[in-house]
Amino acid sequence: MADKEKKKKESILDLSKYIDKTIRVKFQGGREASGILKGFDPLLNLVLDGTIEYMRDPDDQYKLTEDTRQLGLVVCRGTSVVLICPQDGMEAIPNPFIQQQDA
């Protein structure tokens, strides 16, 4: 039993390769932000620097607008993190599940 207690829990994600790189984070409730990853812990609490929040459309909470807000240095609570992805190589594509209306 002593061996089990001493066994350290490992995080499901290896975020060490993203240290000092820009990542994008989605949170419960729909908020999104991107910033430079400065630190993290096994509970996925994140420290982001130069953070930018992407504002949502007031009429449609699931749609992001072009508006942003500068937040600077932030600590993101791991329990509210839904998705983490690298900013490099990410591009927006049209939703393939929505029927495109012909004009």
Curated annotation (Swiss-Prot):
The modification N-acetylalanine is found at A2. GO terms for cellular component: catalytic step 2 spliceosome; cytosol; Lsm1-7-Pat1 complex; Lsm2-8 complex; nucleoplasm; nucleus; spliceosomal tri-snRNP complex; U12-type spliceosomal complex. Keywords: Acetylation, mRNA processing, mRNA splicing, Nucleus, Ribonucleoprotein, RNA-binding, Spliceosome. SUPFAM superfamilies: Sm-like ribonucleoproteins. GO terms for molecular function: U6 snRNA binding. CDD domains: LSm7. InterPro entries: Lsm7, Lsm7/SmG-like, LSM_dom_sf, Sm, Sm_dom_euk/arc. Residues 10-90 form the Sm domain. PROSITE patterns: SM. One of its GO terms (biological process) is nuclear-transcribed mRNA catabolic process. Signal peptide: none annotated. It is found in: Nucleus. Component of the precatalytic spliceosome (spliceosome B complex). Component of the U4/U6-U5 tri-snRNP complex, a building block of the precatalytic spliceosome (spliceosome B complex). The U4/U6-U5 tri-snRNP complex is composed of the U4, U6 and U5 snRNAs and at least PRPF3, PRPF4, PRPF6, PRPF8, PRPF31, SNRNP200, TXNL4A, SNRNP40, SNRPB, SNRPD1, SNRPD2, SNRPD3, SNRPE, SNRPF, SNRPG, DDX23, CD2BP2, PPIH, SNU13, EFTUD2, SART1 and USP39, plus LSM2, LSM3, LSM4, LSM5, LSM6, LSM7 and LSM8. Plays a role in pre-mRNA splicing as component of the U4/U6-U5 tri-snRNP complex that is involved in spliceosome assembly, and as component of the precatalytic spliceosome (spliceosome B complex). The heptameric LSM2-8 complex binds specifically to the 3'-terminal U-tract of U6 snRNA. PANTHER family: SMALL NUCLEAR RIBONUCLEOPROTEIN, U6 SNRNA-ASSOCIATED SM-LIKE PROTEIN LSM7. Belongs to the snRNP Sm proteins family. This is U6 snRNA-associated Sm-like protein LSm7. The lineage of its organism: Eukaryota, Metazoa, Chordata, Craniata, Vertebrata.
